[in-house]
Amino acid sequence: MLAISQDELGGPEVLKATTVPQPDPGVGEILVRVRAAGVNPIDVINRQTGQLVGQPPFILGWDVSGIVEAVGLGVTLYQPGDEVFGLLPFPHGHGAYAEFVVGPARGFVHKPDDLGHVQAAAIPLAGLT
């Protein structure tokens, strides 16, 4: 799958398109096809300093909106095809700047039909602060 990753700390110029393995959902997790990912000040800080995520390489992004592709064992609230948005576990569950992301089902909610993916991806972390 395609992802926006970085191999060094720095400004936006360190972000690059790369190919990485597609993750698989584990117990209690869902695989989401990303339609939009939020960009927050903490993403910029981590891109520059690695403050919460450590040293590169890594894929940033905590806020995500998309479509459920697969569910892990024990997930009953979501099915493939459901539109969802949510917050990946903060601070270590980053990775929304990719075509697909895996996260705990409990970190997502169903996206209302009248809310676009771009708008939905802007809500999670900002809604907590």
Spans of model-derived segments:
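Short structural boundary motif marking the start of a folded domain
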Residues: M1-I4
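Short beta-strand-to-turn element immediately C-terminal to the catalytic PLP-Schiff-base lysine
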Residues: Q6, R47, E69-A70, V102-G103
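Extracellular beta-rich ligand/substrate-recognition surface
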Residues: Q6-V14
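Short beta-strand or tight-loop elements
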Residues: E13-T18, V64
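Extracytoplasmic/periplasmic beta-strand context in beta-sandwich domains
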Residues: T18, D82, A98-E99
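Glycine-rich beta-strand-centered segment in the early N-terminal region that forms part
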Residues: P21-G38, Q48-F90
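Cytochrome P450 core scaffold surrounding the K-helix E-X-X-R motif
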Residues: I42-I45
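NAD(P)H dinucleotide-binding glycine-rich loop of Rossmann-like/cofactor-binding domains
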Residues: L77, L87-T129
